[in-house]
Amino acid sequence: MIDQCLDVAEPVMRTSYPRLYASVDGDTHFQDVPVSMAPVVYLPDMPGAPLVDVATSQSVTALTFSRLEAGFDADWHPAPRRQFVLVLSGGIELTVTDGEMRSFGPGGVYFVEDTTGKGHRTRAVGTGECLVVTVAC
């Protein structure tokens, strides 16, 4: 099973994702969250199956595909729910109240949980539409 990691001294793969959160004063910030992965037998019924590096599973409540038109520009707003956003095509630019701005293109992943406070700005960047998947948790 995926959740049954092999006994290894330390994870073999590390990555991170940006988290967008609201501090107690209502301002928003980015924080890079580390993710550790360990090898698991992902296909246990397949003899000789290669190991796959996997992080701990997280429960999710909804998965939604969305399309942002070229020129989409949402002024300051809190996130509608705690969710990961995966950019499939196009690009997104997020700005938080401390002034930091980050851009995400195809393959980009970030987590928003600023469901209270001043929120963030979201813009579709580039000349075409932006396709995203949101995964609520």
Region roles according to the model:
Residues 24-76, 130-137:
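A short glycine-rich, His/Asp/Glu-containing loop-to-beta-strand
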Residues 73, 78, 84-105:
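A short beta-strand-loop-beta hairpin characteristic of the jelly-roll/cupin
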Residues 2-22:
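Short acidic, Pro/Gly- and aromatic-enriched capping/linker segments at domain boundaries
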Residues 111-115, 125-137:
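A short hydrophobic beta-strand segment most commonly corresponding to one strand
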Residues 71-74, 93, 109-110, 115-121:
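Histidine-centered metal-chelating micro-motifs
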Residues 35-36, 97-115:
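Short acidic-glycine-tyrosine-enriched beta hairpin
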